[in-house]
Design a protein with these regions (language model features):
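N-terminal loops that bind phosphate or other acidic moieties
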Residues: 2-168
Length: 168
């Protein structure tokens, strides 16, 4: 991902507009979420929003805190320490408004994407049972029969986008 916005970019694309206390639309981007008071859903694309969501993640980071989306992945996207503090507070505000536990494993993935999608699923279905946050590597490996391919290979080469404390 290229942003830390808690999934609000997708929500906007689906017609949910983040708003401040005065009912004004927020500026795009994660930093403005510190001002979030709610969402205007008058233009929400209900058929597109009411789907079963399967989010494949490659991390188990929580949304906020020292291991959260802003702290761990913000620097990869060029965030300064000031940006990280702001983005962490913004994601905390989003979690509060969306009634999402910021310590949920995996909710820091993709810039906090599961936060917004959980809110959307709860809005559409009355609960969050229509969102599934799953380990992406395992799901992809199983879908392509990777264990069998590795077993029959002469050489296996893997890669990492950036070697950091998340790398194993």
């Amino acid at each position: 991902t290229a942003t830390v916005d808690g999934g609000t970019g997708i929500l906007v694309a689906l017609g949910a507009t983040p708003q401040d206390k005065a009912g004004h639309p927020l500026r795009p981007g994660g930093g403005s979420l510190t001002e979030l008071a709610g969402f205007d859903t008058a233009q929400l694309n209900i058929p597109a929003a009411a789907v079963e969501w399967v989010l494949l993640t490659d991390v188990t980071n929580p949304a906020t805190g020292p291991d959260g989306a802003a702290a761990v992945f913000g620097p990869q996207k060029g965030a300064t320490s000031k940006d990280i503090t702001l983005l962490d507070a913004a994601l905390a505000q989003l979690c509060d408004i969306c009634e999402v536990d910021p310590t949920t494993p995996g909710f820091g993935a993709a810039g906090g994407l599961p936060i917004g999608i959980t809110w959307l699923s709860t809005l559409m279905h009355g609960n969050h049972s229509h969102i599934h946050v799953l380990p992406g590597a395992r799901m992809v490996a199983e879908s392509v029969g990777l264990p069998e391919l590795i077993h029959s290979a002469d050489l296996v080469v893997t890669g990492e986008g950036r070697f950091d404390k998340q790398s194993t």
